[in-house]
Amino acid sequence: MNVLLCSINTLNRFYDISALEVGQHFYWQIGDFQVHAQVLITSWVVIAILLISTILVVRNPQTIPTSGQNFFEYVLEFIRDVSKTQIGEEYGPWVPFIGTLFLFIFVSNWSGALLPWKIIKLPHGELAAPTNDINTTVALALLTSVAYFYAGISKKGLAYFGKYIQPTPILLPINILEDFTKPLSLSFRLFGNILADELVVVVLVSLVPLVIPIPVMFLGLFTSGIQALIFATLAAAYIGESMEGHH
């Protein structure tokens, strides 16, 4: 009888989880436009965290660096190394862009696990990490596409488009298709990994509270950092590729 009751309770839990509505969104109506408020709120929170922490550390730099200053210098050096490795000697102007991508994605990913978004109640839906929404990841991927087009055209002019018929004009459709697959792979890889991580934690918390979810959350933090690094590295690689003109 006890086994039967346990089985029924387990099934009820699965039923409750499956009954959760997914994809609800909270919108603000601004004129004729609908603004996705959830993404906007969480994105501005992440931006505020980055701005405030940066201002507090660098507003008064010390000759003998503080621990916070040392940390930011290490992060900057790390971003420079990634940019130089992927872009080459002309990496300098692209460090701010690559760094912004990396830091925004990194803090966004970690905010999903460390910030209590769920306690903030909305009329519809709930808050989550900005990168948990496909709108954010697609926007970042499209921004990356604009960046590597700009990098190639600004260096080579209209000759940049000659790459589409290299090494043979027969590859023109494939080379054009590649420009569509790059942002698709960037956006869906980041979105899928962050969404899957949060769903796994939610399900495990529902089934086995405070036992299994903790190591899974630590694993999620690690993979979230890796995803930020992958996105920034690929963005730098695409920019370097467009400037060099080879595949």
From Swiss-Prot:
Annotated InterPro entries: ATP_syn_F0_a_bact/chloroplast, ATP_synth_F0_asu, ATP_synth_F0_asu_AS, F0_ATP_A_sf
Broad class of the protein's primary localization: plastid
GO molecular function: proton-transporting ATP synthase activity, rotational mechanism
Thylakoid recorded as keyword: yes
GO CC, alphabetical: chloroplast thylakoid membrane; plasma membrane; proton-transporting ATP synthase complex
Cellular localisation: Plastid, Chloroplast thylakoid membrane
Cross-referenced CDD domains: ATP-synt_Fo_a_6
Keywords: ATP synthesis, CF(0), Chloroplast, Hydrogen ion transport, Ion transport, Membrane, Plastid, Thylakoid, Transmembrane, Transmembrane helix, Transport
Positions of transmembrane segments: 38-58, 95-115, 134-154, 199-219, 220-240
Membrane-topology annotation of the record: Multi-pass membrane protein
PROSITE patterns in alphabetical order: ATPASE_A
Keyword hit for RNA-binding: no
Known partners and oligomeric status: F-type ATPases have 2 components, CF(1) - the catalytic core - and CF(0) - the membrane proton channel. CF(1) has five subunits: alpha(3), beta(3), gamma(1), delta(1), epsilon(1). CF(0) has four main subunits: a, b, b' and c.
PANTHER family found in the cross-reference section: ATP SYNTHASE SUBUNIT A, CHLOROPLASTIC
Function field: Key component of the proton channel; it plays a direct role in the translocation of protons across the membrane.
Family label: Belongs to the ATPase A chain family.
Designated name of the protein: ATP synthase subunit a, chloroplastic
Organism encoding this protein: Cicer arietinum (Chickpea)
Organism phylogeny: Eukaryota, Viridiplantae, Streptophyta, Embryophyta, Tracheophyta
Gene name of the record: atpI
